[in-house]
Amino acid sequence: MRKIIVLSFITLDGVMQAPGGPEEDTSSSFKYGGWVSPYFDEVADKVMEKQLKPADLLLGRKTFEIFEGYWPQHSANWPGINEVTKYVVSGTRETSDWENTIFLRNLTDIEKLKNGSGTDIQVHGSGELIQLLLKNDLVDELWLKIHPITLGNGKKLFAKG
């Protein structure tokens, strides 16, 4: 059985939306993209280096499309990103030119993936997918990088409940 590990940058008020850049995810008029940048330094780089070891990825479609448009051309910053298998949960997409991409349709496909053999599976971004995984008790570990900032609004890691 494989472990599913969620890696996420979050704020003190639980926002996980668009940590990397202003254009990353502007849905719902989110204007704080790139909020993690002021907190990156050599220590953070070393932590990320260890966490970005080669592991298969499980991504929601929206996050995949952001990754697909960026990482193939910037793979020096994430060694192995092009070689690992990228499992994408999508009801609309079926193909990608990005090597080693496999599309999954539903929860049953995710459960089969988890119950199979192979490396750990990392989830990055993918807020809606994370909610589905948490609701169905499929997350084995949460690796959260909590930053000392509050944004007041944005997509949250933990849904209200």
Roles of regions detected by a PLM:
Residues 1-161:
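Enzymes that bind and transform nitrogen-containing heteroaromatic metabolites
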